[in-house]
Amino acid sequence: VEMLDDARQRTVELTQDLPPERHLGPKLSIVNPPQWEIGHIGFFYDYFVLHKLFGLSNFQIANASQLYDSMGVAHDARWTLDLPSMEDTFDYLRIIRDAMVSRLPEGLTDSATSYVWQLATFHEDMHGEAFAYTRQTLADQMPMIVPPIGGLPCLDSGDLSGEVFVPGGEHTLGADENVGFRFDNEKPAYVRAFDSFTIDISPVTNAAFMRFVEAGGYENPNYWSNRGWVWRDTQALKAPCYWRYNDAGWQVR
């Protein structure tokens, strides 16, 4: 239940402050209308947990699948549906949450219940990421986010510079049935042969990429593919999309 409530807290925090004109927002290929996306989160629980796992014959609101099934509702159509209001959409989430919790057995659950519960909760977490990048795309100010339930661990990341050598040979990709949870695109586990390679210890940080920018990386075609350089030239870019430079130095939106 804590997993579900933590994911739900993030959904609410990332959407509750949106003004009415942003409940749908502009039609862009890389985002969903928040009012639809929140309902889709609810439908995922409604379908996989209440309907498939617990056997409820009816969804918690009428026409749920016609409105929120991402496999059946074309992306561009999501802005023109007769959607419930934002208030009613959040009520839909609350109804589903209560219905799920009331059916959760005491003590440890069986593996099927545990898997579906995790799948649906992690699905909501992924949409939390989508709400965050939608706000970034549309230049919305980020809201105040309460730390996750239980707090954040204080871990020293250590030195992030340098590379690590990965020897060639056979490596297992994906996850087998011995792990507690795996997404469908992580199975089955299979073995692949690789040549040796080196890779950075960590993903590229803003600080590291800033050195590339300040060293003239956006002015030197040697660091770009032909297609990438044409794109950079067409867009007249001097730095990444959300970077701005002023007297204080580089700032990132």
Regions found by a protein language model. Give the residues of each.
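Extended beta-strand/loop cores of jelly-roll/beta-sandwich
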Residues: 1-18, 22-25, 30-34, 40-42, ...
